[in-house]
A protein has these predicted regions:
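Conformationally flexible catalytic loops at phosphate/diphosphate-handling active centers
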Residues: 22, 26, 175, 181-251
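Active-site-proximal loop->helix
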Residues: 61-63, 85, 113-114, 130-152
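Short coil/turn connectors at secondary-structure junctions
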Residues: 42-45, 65-69, 90-97, 119-124, ...
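Short beta-strand segments
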Residues: 100-102, 123-130, 151, 161, ...
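Short gly/pro/ser/thr-enriched loop/turn and capping motifs at secondary-structure boundaries
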Residues: 56, 77-80, 106-108, 131-136, ...
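Conserved thiamine diphosphate
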Residues: 142-189
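Thiamine diphosphate
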Residues: 1-5, 17-103, 247, 252
């Protein structure tokens, strides 16, 4: 393994990312921060990163999170089994670890661990980066059909739309909530979130509309509870049913 960050410690509190979502230089960074932040609040404290270009927003979001533990390895297959071991060792009801990979053959390398996770009922979250719809099926570098690549072994799957494409960032938040419910459920196993990203993949500035794209996430950074447990004006907890329905629609 290439290394592990020494400053981030996996704590029991769901600390928000330190950067303001609205001040992110581009929607990729904001969406990735929401996804990693939600996963952490839902119990995913370890993020195993295999370096790659398309997954840059996810890797940087994991590194930015002040309390997440980040493990780095250049071999996706080994990294996935490491994450599987974290999940098996965490005990019943734990969300386990996430694996972050780039697109293409990097994703295919996760299949052995996904099969093992399914057969042993162990939590394993697979966060894979992908090209946006217009680059699929075009012969673009490191592009394969990643939709439902793990077949029936995945207990949950969602193909998440590109940031800034019209769907609000809370769609990614509810997908994170849905995936971790499976990971922590009575019959855990692999959950797969396929994350589409357009350029720029790094922190380069690009015009976007925070007021439109972050609607429904007002106050998110100040909270430590998962997005699904938002509150009505009367203070009673509720499930974000409309967004959960949207996540289910993506998980087809």
């Amino acid at each position: 393994f290439a290394g592990e960050n020494s400053t981030a410690t996996a704590t029991a509190t769901g600390t928000s990312n330190v950067s303001s979502l609205a001040s992110a230089p581009n929607p990729n960074q904001a969406w990735a921060d929401v996804l990693v932040g939600e996963l952490f609040r839902d119990g995913v404290r370890v993020f195993c990163v295999a370096p790659g270009s398309r997954s840059t927003p996810l890797a940087l979001a994991a590194e930015r999170h002040p309390s997440a533990r980040v493990v780095v390895c250049v071999d996706e297959r080994s990294l996935a089994f490491y994450a599987l071991g974290v999940g098996k060792g965490a005990g019943a009801g734990a969300a386990g670890a996430a694996v972050i990979t780039s697109s293409g053959t990097a994703v295919a390398n996760l299949l052995p661990a996904a099969v093992e996770a399914a057969e042993s009922a162990a939590p394993l979250l697979l966060l894979t980066a992908d090209r946006p719809p217009e680059l699929r099926g075009t012969g673009a570098n490191q592009t394969i059909d990643q939709t439902k690549i793990f077949g029936s072994f995945a207990r949950y799957y969602a193909d998440l739309p590109p940031p800034g494409d019209g769907a609000p960032a809370r769609v990614w938040a509810t997908a994170a909530n849905a995936a971790t419910r499976v990971l922590r459920g009575a019959r855990p196993g692999p959950a797969h979130l396929n994350c589409q990203f357009r350029d720029p993949l790094g922190p380069a500035p690009v015009a976007w509309d925070p007021a439109r794209d972050l609607r429904g996430l007002e106050g998110w950074e100040a909270r430590t509870t998962p997005f699904s447990f938002t509150h009505r004006d009367d203070g009673e907890p509720r499930s974000a049913s409309r967004d959960a329905s949207g996540a289910r629609a993506l998980a087809r």
